[in-house]
Amino acid sequence: MKFDPESIKKAAKEDFDSAWTSGKDLIKKTGLNQQYPHTSFHFGKAHPVYDTIAKLREAYLRMGFDEMMNPLIVDEKEVYKQFGHEALAVLDRCYYLAGLPRPNVGISDQRIAKIKEMLGGIDDEGIETIRKVLHSYKKGEVEGDDLVPEIALKLNVSDALVVEMIDKVFPEFKELTPQATTKTLRSHMTSGWFISLSGILERSRPPFHLFSIDRSFRREQQEDASRLMTYYSASCVIMDEDVTVDHGKAVAQGLLAQFGFEKFMFRPDEKRSKYYVPDTQIEVFAYHPKLVGSNTKYSDGWIEIATFGIYSPTALAEYNIPCPVMNLGLGVERLAMILHDSTDLRGMTYPQLPQYAEWELKDNELARMIFVDKLPETPEGQEILEGIVMQCDMHGSEPSPCEFVAWEGILKGKKVKVSVIEPEEDTKLCGPAAYNEVLVHENDVLGLPNNKKWKKAFENHSARTGVRFIEAFAAQAAKEIEEAVEKGEKECETRVRIVKVPSEINIKLDPLAQRYITGKKQKIDIRGPVFTTVRAEIE
């Protein structure tokens, strides 16, 4: 809280130790549900795939490649030009784009009557206006999302009325079915490279060193741990009269070495695609130490990570490209799985979707989902809470019967005296579990004593709530005393005995935490003998 420097300097000159000690009174006290780890600074996290894309971009740029954006929508005729006799096999894996046709809508006398009935006050001129707008829509002069506002504007009626009119008078719009075009979503980055290189040659002379990292789409029969219907391809090309397979090997090593790969093997690809020169299509296998001993089929450290080849002159000639072109491509997601220790492509790509990814929470995240339920609302209530805790800390082991005053003062206009008591004989003011702290250890929510046995659990301060049973109980007692004063009661007693569940000691868990713990078959073990009583006398 804010303080006056002049008064502090004056007090320090008069009695430095006293001024120094009283400094703690100027620091705001944190509420039980606001203290660390509830108070924390959130930091953003990059998605594994986009993080890998960013690193790949930097790696390519460091190698002197210029970045390009290749066409994403490719007409099927381009696929035929590039892949020749293999085109049908390639197109079988492509998504074709389709669109809704624009119907030729007529307006009969029956429809005119219905329109006039629904819109009210529409004359023949208004009907002609609707007819013209529909005709413009058919010709593509009015876009689909502009149809309703265009009619509403020209007729000076509400959009809602026009929507209802179209729905009931023109059922053709509801009966439209998509019609396929010859345009496809790119399934290989190669489809875009041929188009881009052809265009570049009209304005520049080779050599070119280019790269592009972007989405491709492939019509898989199903998605699984290693295949998705849409993925990112990190592709590069070198156009040079003297380019060879050795350039592909050099690019593969230069690129992948930046990601920790240490050894490389190059093997002829059995696929032998016709858009590559025979015997130039090469698979790149690379060794990464992070894979060694992993729970994957790559536990020996080696993984197939990229493919490169020299584009066939027969394909390049279709685009009037007179120079050899080396192309190398790799799947971003596969590289991301290595860098981010993932074993399932779906779970890494879509971690927010329960059907793909396991739900994982860290202990500190669970700790932030644990709260004290009932809390005092007044400054005096907070003082009562602190007074109860202080007396229990000081006298918890005192033999009973015993009584200790925790607070006296005015609360909401009433004189109140609060005491911690134990009327029974041969026991203590507080039970042995009163000083257990609520924390999370290995995804279990526990109430534990801070002793040598549980040293490991208490080492992680980020998973400790900082709330002991006695603080949670004192908060409940203070809250109930506030409520008793409001109700005009003369006495209030709050007692806790053997705790069996969190609610019995005024602890609650966020429903998300409850669901997570139940789903993971972890445990919530907050229990123990607390045996503490607080009594308030109200005048």
Swiss-Prot record:
Example of a GO biological process term: translation
MF GO annotations: ATP binding; phosphoserine-tRNA(Cys) ligase activity; tRNA binding
Record-listed substrate binding positions: H188, M189, T190, S233, A234, S235, Y275, Y276, N327
InterPro entries: aa-tRNA-synth_II (IPR006195), aa-tRNA-synth_II/BPL/LPL (IPR045864), O-Pseryl-tRNA(Cys)_ligase (IPR005246), Phenylalanyl-tRNA_Synthase (IPR002319), SepRS_C (IPR041590)
EC number, as in UniProt: 6.1.1.27
Keyword Protein biosynthesis: yes
Catalytic activity: tRNA(Cys) + O-phospho-L-serine + ATP = O-phospho-L-seryl-tRNA(Cys) + AMP + diphosphate
Record key words, sorted: Aminoacyl-tRNA synthetase, ATP-binding, Ligase, Nucleotide-binding, Protein biosynthesis
Keyword match ATP-binding: yes
HAMAP family reported in the protein's UniProt record: Sep_tRNA_synth
Family: Belongs to the class-II aminoacyl-tRNA synthetase family. O-phosphoseryl-tRNA(Cys) synthetase subfamily.
Task of the protein: Catalyzes the attachment of O-phosphoserine (Sep) to tRNA(Cys).
Quaternary assembly: Homotetramer. Interacts with SepCysS.
Protein name: O-phosphoserine--tRNA(Cys) ligase
